[in-house]
Regions:
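Short beta-strand/loop motif that positions the catalytic acidic residue
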Residues: 117-118, 122-125, 129
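Acidic catalytic loop of the alpha/beta-hydrolase fold
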Residues: 15-16, 127-132
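A conserved short beta-strand
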Residues: 83-98
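Active-site catalytic motif of lipid deacylating hydrolases and related acyltransferases
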Residues: 2-60, 180
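Short alpha-helix in the alpha/beta-hydrolase fold that links the catalytic acid
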Residues: 22, 133-141
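Gly/Ala-rich beta-loop-alpha elbow adjacent to hydrolase catalytic centers
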Residues: 64-75
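Post-His helix in hydrolase/transferase enzymes
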Residues: 159-175
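Catalytic histidine neighborhood in serine/cysteine hydrolases
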Residues: 32, 142-158
Length: 183
């Protein structure tokens, strides 16, 4: 667990089950999960409100660890309330603008803000993610002014990817914190 920042875990549509790397990180590193009232029928307004409450409840600056739909949540949040966010680690950003890639219930998060984030960020993508084309994920990273890593063919980088606690991902997250001078 970092001592200079609070780390908030932001799952995407459907939440992250017990074998998802986000759940492992929460258990193993003491990070906090931002809970949503409805994981299966999200509304941008409700999710933004819950994220804002979670950020405001922290006594320190915050680093966000987002997966899938929650990456769009972070981009929207950055448009209005970024002051306590010190960085974001964005994994498998779902392309909520694509009917081919994303279910209807997630499209209420579009359009995806494509302006530079006001805090350092890093996007991690897979070369065969069914919810975002690899080049589109890199486009998001470039638009947001974020670093970018393609970890190869690991699907949606979730429990089905077979990564377990994904120690390589956590090492990359820690390296980002150090690079951002937050570790």
């Amino acid at each position: 667990m970092t001592h200079s920042v609070s780390v908030l875990i932001l799952p995407g549509l459907g939440n992250s089950g017990s074998e998802h790397w986000q759940s492992h990180w929460q258990r193993e590193h003491g990070y906090s999960r931002v809970e949503q009232a409805d994981w299966d029928r999200p509304t941008l307004r409700d999710w933004l409100s819950n994220l804002g409450q979670a950020v405001n409840a922290q006594s320190r600056g915050v680093v966000l660890v987002a997966h899938s739909l929650a990456c769009s949540l972070v981009a929207h949040f950055a448009q209005t309330r970024p002051d306590r966010v010190l960085g974001a680690f964005l994994v498998s950003p779902a392309d909520v603008e694509s009917e081919r890639c994303t279910p209807e219930e997630a499209r209420c998060f579009s359009p995806i803000p494509l302006t530079p984030l006001p805090f350092p960020a890093h996007v991690v993508a897979s070369s065969n993610d069914p919810y975002v084309d690899r080049d589109r994920a890199e486009f998001f990273a470039t638009s947001w002014g974020a670093g970018f890593t393609d970890i190869g063919a690991f699907g949606h980088i979730n429990a089905s990817s077979g990564l377990g606690a994904w120690p390589e991902g956590h090492a990359q997250f820690r390296a980002c914190l150090a690079h951002w001078a937050l570790a």
